[in-house]
Structure formats: structure tokens, C-alpha cells
Amino acid sequence: MSSRLAGKLIFVTAAAQGMGRASVIALAREGARIIATDIRDDLLQSLRDEVIAAGGAAPEIHRLDVTEPGAIESMIGSLPPLDVLFNCAGFVHQGTILQASDDDWDFSFAINVRSMVRSIRAALPGMISRRTGSIINMASVCSSIKGLPNRAVYGTTKAAVLGLTKSIAADYVSSGIRCNAICPGTVDTPSLHQRMAQLGDIEEARRMFTARQPMGRLAGADEIVPIVVYLASDESSFATGQWFNIDGGITI
């Protein structure tokens, strides 16, 4: 355990699995105080235990549905000003535009975009009052950076996340607030496993996802975590309005 993030209060959405879970463990190991939230409250307790076992301070855990109006605002409003907001919640819709209903679009925008708008809007006043804060948005290389097949809804929402990131950075740079986005390639997470299962043949799906990665393999969640820690730390104090591609060469 080090002290790179000692004393920092960090709020994380979608903390129970995948990249969110790995990030909470790493952030806590660096000395941060974590507010870990997820709709899967059954997994949050095991996360708490894992953080403690890894040498970090026990995170404060809360069930949170980021699509519920007022829920994010109420939770963040009950806390002291945040040092770091990590928006990790997301949903991947599979299919073309002709395979996506209005409900599909609404649901994806609610999770992938509107939840970030709400959390940022709730966190900003406290950050501005202290003239410091780092906002980290989970985006994707599948966005305005690169088009991928069968990702019409997802790519559109993640392009919106990049636009939101740039806008927040531009509006609040003079207030001491930084806002950046992380754009992973294909990461081996429970979310990916669900998408593989939806395709029917899991092994063929894994081969398909792996084939689009020039490195010939999927990323592990632990390979995304270092950039999360960097953006949460004061080491990134001169970085804002940027997106960081951690994609195994997919955007070369």
C-alpha cells in the first residue's frame, strides 16, 4: 500500500464487477477513501472483503441504480465534496440500428450518458467550492474514435461521453476541475461474458472478439486500472479534456 491517493474521497459507479471492481481495489490500495456503488449489492460485500484483504481501507458500499431519477444526486449530495468522480457504469447493446428499438436507445442513453450527466452535475458544486476535482468517464474506442460492427447504439452513446468529457473540461478548467475519459478496447469482464453467451457459441464469440484485437488477445481489467489511478492522482494535474486509448492497438 502506498499513499498516492491518501486522503482523497472517490465515488465510483458500477464498482462491483469488472473494471470498476479492479479499480476500487487499486484505488483503495493507494490510500483513497472509496464510496463504492452498484446495482448488484450482493457483490458489494465481497468487494469490501477483497479490498481489505488487498491492504486497502474498507470502502463504503451502497446499492445504487444509476438510472433512477434523483438517486445519484441524493447520494452524492449526502457526502462531503468529492476529490474524484469515476463514472464506470455502462451497458453494451448488440446490433445494428435496424435491430435497436426506441427503448433500446433510451435505456442505453440512460445508463451510458444521462447517469454521467447527473453524477457530474451533483459533484461539481462541491469540487468548484474547493477549486479541485478529477472526473473520470469510462468511454470506449467504439465511439467517435472508431466504428465497430453491431455497436450502433453503444458507439453513439460513447461518442456522447467523449463530447460530454470535452465540454466539462472546457467549462470548468479555470475552476480547477479536470475531466478525462478512458477508452478501452475489448476487456475480459463479466459484461463481455454475458455478451458472448448471448451470441450462442461462447468459444466462437471469444475468437471473434479476440480477432479484432491486433495484439491477438483480450485485455485484463488490471491493464485498465493504472490509468484510472493516474487520473485520480495529482500526477495527472495538468491533464484535462483528453481521452486515453488503452486498446491493444485497435486504433492504430
What spans do the regions from the language model cover?
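Active-site helix of classical SDR
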Residues: I120, T157, T165
